Amino acid sequence: MNLENYFISQFSNTHIGDDGALIDGVVYSKDAFFENVHFKTSWMSYYQIAQKAMLVNISDAIAMNAQPKYALLSVAMPSDISKSQMQELANGFKDIAKKYKVEIIGGDTISNTKLDITVTIVSITTKPLKRVGTKENYLVAHTGKIGKSKKDLSKLMNLGSIHKKSKFVNIELREKFVSISSRLLSSGMDISDGLFSDLEKLASANKIGFKFSKKISKSIACSGEEYEMLVTFDKRDKKAMIRRAIQSRTKLTIFAKTIRNKYINRCKSHHFKR
């Protein structure tokens, strides 16, 4: 068990284990977005930083087929931040909130040595999509194209530059695809830690393994911060799922099926390194 899973296991209860905690039709989710851990201010504008901080949190709501309604922001700002940079941050938060019809209802601000952001999203759902629910011989698929986020991160780490529309900066969420497909999906989650690592979470939740029908390179499958959807569904619904992908203009790649076997994650955890 890696250190992240070990720590989470200390608080194990029925609400922990999904992208958010589901309680009476309400989904509560929270993620951190810290300078020098998730980003550097030389990589992105303050506006882009705020946008991404909101989007990675809204992604958790969408992954559970929930409608985000409210946000609480905690922002630790460096003491030398300027008013114009503060305005950029505020505009980034507000523009994403407006796009997804989310009301920012409060939070906290403190002075810090660097820029650290945590966001709590409160969402509602009538048909939650959870990680638990898939069965043996179900199909496994992901949306979009994965692997580019890690490549662009590598460029930034090596003092290179990336396109302004890079997936590392501009996250595309799959709310329409999830909404129209939810009735057919047996389980799902967003790809935040990388395909192989998030498959490990599905395997653990459902006590299954996977038989791959497509070869996926380790460099692509270990790419984190993709925020595409990882889903499973009955093979009898394959045509219906393809129709829904076309309807929502979403690329859907079916790459495996679930089997009764132990799954081994080939990627190293990037949360805790020794």
Residue ranges of predicted features:
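Acidic, Ser/Thr/Pro-rich beta/coil linker or hinge segments at domain junctions
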Residues: 168-172, 245-274
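Helix N-cap motif at beta-to-alpha junctions
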Residues: 232-239
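N-terminal glycine-rich phosphate/pyrophosphate-binding loops that anchor nucleotide-derived ligands
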Residues: 1-62, 102, 126, 138, ...
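Small-aliphatic-rich amphipathic alpha-helix that forms the alpha element of a beta-alpha
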Residues: 46-71, 91-99, 174-176, 180, ...
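Short, compositionally biased
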Residues: 151-168
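Active-site-proximal betaalpha loop/short-helix elements
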Residues: 80, 168-226, 265
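Glycine-rich anion-binding loops of enzyme active sites
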Residues: 33, 69-154, 257
